[in-house]
């Protein structure tokens, strides 16, 4: 496969969102900023977080109101090894910056660049490190919280459901290790979640907005890869980015 470079010199880009005008909006986690990549390869900054040591825009998605909703992981420690940047202090094994306070769900006005923080906690427990999100047909969204890793311990992850106006948030899946990418089946009846460290992809039956038949789910892929974000094709195939292997594709019949 021949790959074409469209834009360079981005500070750890993730969360690409294809826009109607042909541009692609990405987060630059190490920026931390939200950037538009135009079809000709030029870039323009939409907004920057004013607390770079404790902000880390991660997954992003356009909401029903046209605003961009961003998982803010609260910032990382960084290491540069052999020309590559890693969101982790390789010496200590920690990725939690000293300035870290909390993770959050942020809303960005794409016209003005204004950032509004919608959620920093759920039922009195802070969001540790939100990672990826996906909207459903009712206008609500599911999001993963991968958490933070410290020298001697790490957070247990979770999956949440929230409303885009900041009015309601609920914890739907608890104690899941490193939940990363998430997506919905074309009919909106199934939630998919990829785990980074286990290399597994899980499927959960949705019974109503923000409600699952069971928080246990069904494992539809068990790999040796370290999984990242995902996308679900119109035909139902689940495509997951694997950090070293490339792309993992789970067919609609889950083979």
Model-derived segments and their meaning:
Residues 1-255:
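Sequence-structural signature of mature extracellular/luminal beta-sheet repeat domains
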């Amino acid at each position: 496969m021949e790959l074409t470079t469209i834009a360079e010199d981005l500070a750890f880009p993730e969360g690409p969102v294809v826009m109607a005008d042909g541009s692609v909006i990405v987060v630059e986690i190490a920026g931390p900023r939200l950037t538009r990549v135009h079809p000709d390869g030029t870039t323009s900054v939409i907004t920057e977080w004013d607390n770079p040591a404790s902000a880390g825009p991660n997954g992003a998605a356009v909401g029903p109101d046209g605003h961009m909703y961003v998982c803010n992981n609260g910032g990382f420690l960084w290491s540069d090894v052999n020309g590559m940047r890693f969101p982790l202090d390789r010496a200590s094994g920690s990725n939690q910056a000293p300035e870290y306070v909390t993770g959050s769900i942020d809303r960005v006005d794409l016209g003005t660049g204004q950032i509004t923080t919608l959620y920093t906690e759920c039922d009195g427990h802070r969001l540790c490190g939100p990672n990826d999100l996906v909207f459903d047909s009712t206008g609500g969204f599911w999001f993963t919280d991968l958490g933070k890793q410290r020298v001697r311990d790490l957070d247990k992850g979770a999956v949440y459901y929230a409303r885009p106006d900041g009015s309601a948030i609920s914890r739907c899946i608890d104690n899941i290790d490193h939940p990363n990418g998430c997506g919905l089946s074309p009919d909106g009846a199934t939630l998919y979640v990829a785990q980074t460290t286990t290399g597994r992809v899980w499927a959960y039956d949705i019974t109503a907005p923000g409600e699952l038949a069971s928080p246990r789910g069904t494992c539809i892929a068990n790999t040796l890869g370290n999984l990242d974000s995902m996308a679900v094709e119109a035909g139902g195939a689940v495509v997951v980015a694997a950090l070293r292997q490339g792309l993992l594709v789970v067919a609609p019949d889950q083979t």
